[in-house]
């Protein structure tokens, strides 16, 4: 059976416009003619300007999460600064709007993803959304099964509304993984 590629005109990327992985997801989306919605907030340094959606104070509050809960869930401590809280709130909007989630980062031994990006991956798990992480350190894609991470050689975007997020420290292999993902899918 022949698999038909997604129609890019039907798709929307939900991301965050920050430097690194989010910017690379946006560049790939633009190259393929995909609409972009980049959630941001006043005072955030955005690298992308296409599809900017500035979240209001009330919208940010919708994505608020207890840092005590998050610290227990992620097995680490987070700083309680207004900027970090807004970053977590904006990530909530990315994941909430995406039907399928793609992350660039590093999976730690405890199964969580490193950094603030890890909240996006954990929220996707909690919402039971298809979740893929490209681990830059292992140079490989992983898919969350609901219980564990398993190798996924060539994932494709299969939902019209998808989220792309990840580390600000994007390595060449991470950028290639994003470009290859879009080329396979569209």
Task: Give the ranges of each region predicted by the language model.
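Acidic/glycine-enriched connector segments
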Residues: 3-186
């Amino acid at each position: 059976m022949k698999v038909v590629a997604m129609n890019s005109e039907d798709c929307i990327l939900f991301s965050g416009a920050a430097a690194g992985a989010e910017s690379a997801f946006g560049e790939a989306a633009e190259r393929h003619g995909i609409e972009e919605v980049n959630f941001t907030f006043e005072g955030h340094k955005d690298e992308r300007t296409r599809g900017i959606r500035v979240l209001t104070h009330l919208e940010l509050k919708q994505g608020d999460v207890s840092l005590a809960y998050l610290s227990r869930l992620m097995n680490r401590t987070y700083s309680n600064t207004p900027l970090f809280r807004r970053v977590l709130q904006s990530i909530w909007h990315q994941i909430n709007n995406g039907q399928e989630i793609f992350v660039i980062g590093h999976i730690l031994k405890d199964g969580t993803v490193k950094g603030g990006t890890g909240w996006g991956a954990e929220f996707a798990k909690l919402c039971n959304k298809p979740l893929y992480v490209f681990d830059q350190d292992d140079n490989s894609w992983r898919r969350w099964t609901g219980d564990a991470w398993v190798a996924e050689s060539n994932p494709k975007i299969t939902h019209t509304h998808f989220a792309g997020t990840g580390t600000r420290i994007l390595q060449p292999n991470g950028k290639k993984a994003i470009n290859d993902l879009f080329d396979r899918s569209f």
